[in-house]
Swiss-Prot record:
Similarity remark: Belongs to the class-II pyridoxal-phosphate-dependent aminotransferase family. Histidinol-phosphate aminotransferase subfamily.
SUPFAM superfamilies linked: PLP-dependent transferases
Keywords: Amino-acid biosynthesis, Aminotransferase, Histidine biosynthesis, Plasmid, Pyridoxal phosphate, Transferase
Residues bearing PTM N6-(pyridoxal phosphate)lysine: K223
Source species taxonomy: Bacteria, Pseudomonadati, Pseudomonadota, Alphaproteobacteria, Hyphomicrobiales
Organism: Sinorhizobium fredii (strain NBRC 101917 / NGR234)
Enzyme class: transferase
Subunit-structure text: Homodimer.
Co-factor(s): pyridoxal 5'-phosphate
Pathway(s) annotated for this protein in UniProt: Amino-acid biosynthesis; L-histidine biosynthesis; L-histidine from 5-phospho-alpha-D-ribose 1-diphosphate: step 7/9
Protein name: Histidinol-phosphate aminotransferase
Gene3D superfamilies: Aspartate Aminotransferase, domain 1, Type I PLP-dependent aspartate aminotransferase-like (Major domain)
Length: 368
């Protein structure tokens, strides 16, 4: 018998999709058509790819007439070797955003729930809506402590999985790996840990992947490896969890350039160390400068800073003022962050331009 969706259910799905698209369309474009902007709103890494990585991309164009591997095996094996795992513990994706979408599809259905630390990556709200699921937003503890009790008991106990990022986006705060391990060890649920910014942090939970079958770790080459436009991401976890995701992954989900660049980055990871040192240095320089200008800046372990603006204005006002000066920063939809901006850390000239604009705006405010 052919199964059909009831009119009421169809209406609910369409209503949910309409709300998702409305929210997407309300966001300012993250890629302005005017190349004159200093772009500090999406945490991209503005440094050039190493020469060897660029050469791998050019060489891949010679194979543009061939389909890529449908199982990403070369890239998965390269990642497994680089991170001391086996290939069946690795899934490769068209950025970690594709992998997040797969996780929601694999583990959630209408009416299910997922627990997420809040504030967190806003994209997860849209993914939950698309699955007809509920997003349970659990507030971070004081001083960004991991609220283990709240995640293990209460409403979060019924969640299909727990999602958190370390370092966290948008705050940049970092949770000690011992606390992450305590959560994973005590939880009966899958714990999805997004480590998109981990190369700017003091430690990683990678060593826990072989210890716990309920930990799924996400990585991306968009932030610390300057490859956001090429779209390379990974998931590391137990073979059964990885297999469940790969079973619903589209064939040829990555192209030949993504494969080649991903393998090359893995082979040349050490060449990015200077890039990472520069970003950490600029992050501290900008933090100190903003603090002197009256901003309250959260200590960060990522390639961005969350800054609470001086009293009297909000984040939207500062975003608009900076945009008029061709500087793009992020404003945030999270409750309690209305008076904040998030600033990506780029090159020294970019950060000099940002600080000069902030000083100019601050001076104009004080003279009134």
């Amino acid at each position: 018998m052919e199964r059909t969706m009831s009119d009421a259910k169809l209406q609910r799905v369409l209503s949910s999709l309409t709300e998702v698209y409305r929210q997407l369309n309300s966001l300012p474009s993250s890629q302005p058509s005017d190349a004159g902007y200093v772009k500090l709103d999406t945490n991209e890494n503005p440094f050039a790819l190493p020469k060897a990585v660029m050469q791998s991309a050019v060489a891949a164009l010679e194979r543009q007439y061939l389909y890529p591997e449908d199982d990403n095996i070369s890239l998965r094996e390269a990642a497994a070797a680089s991170y001391d795992l086996s290939a069946d513990q690795v899934i490769a994706g068209n950025g970690s955003s594709e992998l997040l979408s797969l996780i929601y599809k694999a583990f959630l259905g209408p009416g299910d729930s997922v627990a997420m630390l809040s504030p967190g990556f806003a994209y997860n709200r849209k993914l939950a809506q698309l699955q007809g699921a509920r997003l349970l937003e659990i507030k971070w503890g004081e001083s960004s402590l991991l609220p283990i009790h709240e995640l293990l008991f209460g409403p979060a106990k019924q969640a299909k999985f727990i999602l958190l990022a370390n370092p966290n986006n948008p705050t940049g705060t970092f949770v000690p790996i011992a606390d992450i391990e305590s959560l994973v060890a005590l939880s009966d649920q899958l714990v999805v840990l997004d480590e998109a910014y981990v190369d700017f942090a003091p430690d990683s939970a990678l060593r826990l992947v072989n210890r716990y079958s309920n930990l799924l770790l996400l990585r991306t080459f968009s932030k610390s490896y300057a490859a956001a436009g090429i779209r390379v991401g990974f998931g590391f976890g137990h073979p059964e969890v990885i297999g469940r995701l790969r079973n619903i992954q589209n064939m040829f989900n990555m192209n030949v350039i993504g494969h080649a660049v991903g393998v090359s980055i893995l082979a040349h990871r050490a060449t990015y160390n200077e890039n990472h040192r520069h970003i950490r240095h600029e992050r501290e320089r900008v933090r100190v400068a903003l603090s002197r200008l009256g901003f309250s800046v959260t200590p960060s372990h990522a390639n961005f800073l969350l800054a609470r603006v001086p009293a009297g204005r909000d984040g939207v006002w500062w975003h608009a003022c900076l945009k008029r000066k061709k500087i793009l920063v992020a404003v945030l939809p999270d409750e309690g962050l209305e008076d904040c901006i998030r600033v990506s850390i780029g090159t020294k000239p970019q950060m000099d331009a940002f600080l000069a604009a902030v000083e100019d705006i601050s001076g104009a405010q004080q003279s009134r």
